Amino acid sequence: PLIPITGQTLAIGLVVTILGLKHGTYAVLLYILLGAIGLPVFQSFTGGLGILFGPTGGYIIGFIPTAIVIGFYLKKTRLTFTHALVANILGMLVTLAFGAVWLKYLAELSWTGALFSGVIPFLIVGVIKAILAAWVGVIVRQRLEQANILRTI
């Protein structure tokens, strides 16, 4: 497929669920910056500006507003699995929206083509990753807070 299924979105959800809005967003920005300067942190151990300007670039750039949406939602609610799941599903939709718009213009697809190439194939696996990010993220964050390793965010 033009757009691969990766663990990146799971990682973004986990990082922001655990670290919160500010630190989670900073971590995502650092991840994108490291990839942009050429470190092989993107899918298939790739990096560089060419990746950001290629077919997957919209998804990667979309990780920034995704982190903000997840972090903001969790900041305004109690840390529960349900809230974390809603936050991560919203984040997934933000990532897919950025990716589809980017893909539409880069590949000169119709909106329908962008939807069928860049969104629909990722919905089920995206929900599975959102469930995992919420489940693991809430447990890890609560334990880090209980151990006074991470302040309550």
Predicted regions mapped to residue ranges:
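Short helix-perturbing small/polar motifs within transmembrane alpha-helices
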Residues: 49-97
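Alpha-helical transmembrane segments and their cytosolic interface
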Residues: 116-153
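Generic alpha-helical transmembrane segments of integral inner-membrane proteins
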Residues: 14, 29, 33, 64-69, ...
